[in-house]
Amino acid sequence: MTDLPDSTRWQLWIVAFGFFMQSLDTTIVNTALPSMAQSLGESPLHMHMVIVSYVLTVAVMLPASGWLADKVGVRNIFFTAIVLFTLGSLFCALSGTLNELLLARALQGVGGAMMVPVGRLTVMKIVPREQYMAAMTFVTLPGQVGPLLGPALGGLLVEYASWHWIFLINIPVGIIGAIATLMLMPNYTMQTRRFDLSGFLLLAVGMAVLTLALDGSKGTGLSPLAITGLVAVGVVALVLYLLHARNNHRALFSLKLFRTRTFSLGLAGSFAGRIGSGMLPFMTPVFLQIGLGFSPFHAGLMMIPMVLGSMGMKRIVVQVVNRFGYRRVLVATTLGLSLVTLLFMTTALLGWYYVLPFVLFLQGMVNSTRFSSMNTLTLKDLPDNLASSGNSLLSMIMQLSMSIGVTIAGLLLGLFGSQHVSVDSGTTQTVFMYTWLSMAFIIALPAFIFARVPNDTHQNVAISRRKRSAQ
């Protein structure tokens, strides 16, 4: 990339900072949740909605981000994304109640949903095709550093300042990024087809109300009648989308995608698999602080081995899949992650705290292998004219399943515990033990889906996508 013009390199730095802001905010909040609960006068059992409100908003808004960038221009949308994310951070820091914090997190999510996909689109437009891979590696590297720094930085700020600072640190970075975007980034636009607003609204309503209904009376305090009504609305919205998308060439996501068996299996496995995996980044720091009495900073440091294991495994995951095939790798890593989850709980309850970093490192390795394998399995056989749509649907499903996973984790805590779980409670570790056992069971379930992957899905096919007609 040394032969790129200086202006292009500055534009890549802007995109990289956007990736860093979004990835840092995804993990920095987790270690602060118990302190937030105490400050806001809420039960820790309700704080999972701080994560759900952000991730669910990202899932809902993702399908619109690419179309908006093509229609309005990448500079305008990227600038808007940074401004919304920064304003959301400010409102989060100023929140005095949980409901205010949830609304502010949703505003952050709107910005976060546009930041990463529009950033990728920007790189595609400003960099020659032969240098695209090197440029994407450069801009995504800060996105890998964010999860590494997030838990420890969040714990440090909570312990030595207050939880408000995990949001306030975004403000100067956001201001600099917004100014740099206006000054340096070109405003590429493209001719766009008509946006499928009806399909977008149907999917948004379906995802949002079903997730809210899943949270149920334990999290939102809704009556059984209200929950039943939400489920009915959500199911009807999704069924209407299926009817809307059938034989509709302008549909948000074409149903032709599901004619590819590996896409259908991979998408179903990714959805179910990330529900289980999505529980772990939320539950681990909460358990370390509330269940074991760790300080926020100590709990944040304990998350670093998991990120290191994940980053290290990415270097060899292709060779592993080529050697053993998708079915074996996905079934083995799914069951392995379930066992590692049980190992973490057992080690923690026995008081072998010095072993926990090694267990979390192993968890990161297994999880990373499974994530990479799920992603490539889902997309590898799609025809070229459906690849972009399939990738967008996968990105949306990834965010949606993570929000559902965190919601289920909060629901499990509510089922097994009282409304006020604290370090001083004698039953706290028992509550977490039952929750962890349930999580291990949920994590293992997608193995039944991955067992249906064709046995010959392996080796060089892992990297290439067959070109064939979508008709």
UniProtKB/Swiss-Prot annotation:
Report the sequence similarity comment from the record: Belongs to the major facilitator superfamily. TCR/Tet family.
The family database entries (CDD domains) matched by this protein are listed as: MFS_LmrB_MDR_like
Q: Which GO terms describe its molecular function?
A: transmembrane transporter activity
Tell where it localizes.
Cell inner membrane
PROSITE patterns of this UniProt entry?
MFS
The residues exposed to the Periplasmic compartment are: 1-11, 70-76, 125-137, 186-196, 246-262, 307-341, 417-430
Gene, per the UniProt record: mdtD
- Highest taxon listed in the record's lineage: Bacteria
One annotated Gene Ontology cellular component of this protein: plasma membrane
Segments on the Cytoplasmic face: 33-48, 98-101, 159-164, 218-224, 284-285, 363-395, 452-471
Q: Which cysteine pairs make disulfide bonds?
A: none
Record membrane topology:
Multi-pass membrane protein
Q: Which organism is it from?
A: Escherichia coli O127:H6 (strain E2348/69 / EPEC)
Which residue ranges does UniProt annotate as crossing the membrane?
12-32, 49-69, 77-97, 102-124, 138-158, 165-185, 197-217, 225-245, 263-283, 286-306, 342-362, 396-416, 431-451
By what name is this protein known? Putative multidrug resistance protein MdtD
- Kindly state which keywords UniProt assigns to this record, in alphabetical order: Cell inner membrane, Cell membrane, Membrane, Transmembrane, Transmembrane helix, Transport
